[in-house]
């Protein structure tokens, strides 16, 4: 008797049973798909690579995938299993496979391009390029370029991830071909020469070699490198002091060296804190908004710094806010897209609310994913001690209610 957790496989292949169907081998010597049919609920797509890159037609791969494919049906649907159309499932599967195999777009083994039947397909393209004596693994998908002597492969998952281009011939952009060529410092295109690789299995091990220039030129890694160099200098200074202590032994020099080590540790903490603050400001530069009510003073949209005088004669109320864009909305609201200054505590009222000529209003939170993402991030940073409790973040500013309104007269006063 079958338990409730067991899966009842529904065969959607051809009319013959799997044991009676002869294994149809794909004529593509490069991509040999073998579907493991030992278990009904598991399908393992095994790629076996050969030395050549001659690939067969699409119908062979579709025929093999359809002939040895089972779709598991839950046991609780056993009463209506006869209502499930095997033919419709087979047609749907075949149409999806045909669409995957006939599409010109390069499909990668990721969750974005995965079909409804959990097939991770990456089809090779027929290529008649002249291959060298090296044996290439079919883990990489080679496609023919406009030049017959080059075969390139580019994989770009997102815009923020570097795209890698592999070529089997000399790079026309550079006179001398090397194992790793960073073509442009502004772009993230990296070329790796396949001829220098002895075995294709060593390609994942070489990731650190051609990722090193990208990580080195990344703006977020420069602060970490400066911090590491500063720590090395502090270690050298402390080692020099200990050598002096050994030559001229004195109690005061040991005391000063311990004081210096404490100072260097504190300086490293300050350095890391400054780098973290720089990262936070660079990441939150696009979400910083400050909303003002339109004052009586005429504002010049071309001005770079907004300077207003308060009732006490103080100037530059928006100190530390370098405003580049002024946007005038309806109902006389003025919003600035600003970049904060490191030496200015943002949204800290220096005067009472009623004495400010420009009153910043705190709006209600927008029910969008960006607000909740920033709110959760700031909560986690406060919990981890990365963000001080005295500084008000962007999400906390929007989340907190408006300040209390001070009436000149009692609100309960009724005029007759």
Swiss-Prot record:
GO cellular component: cell division site; cytosol
Keyword entries, A-Z: Cytoplasm
Compartment list: Cytoplasm
Cited function: May have a role in meiosis and sporulation.
Protein's name according to its UniProt entry: Meiotically up-regulated protein PB1A10.08
Organism: Schizosaccharomyces pombe (strain 972 / ATCC 24843) (Fission yeast)
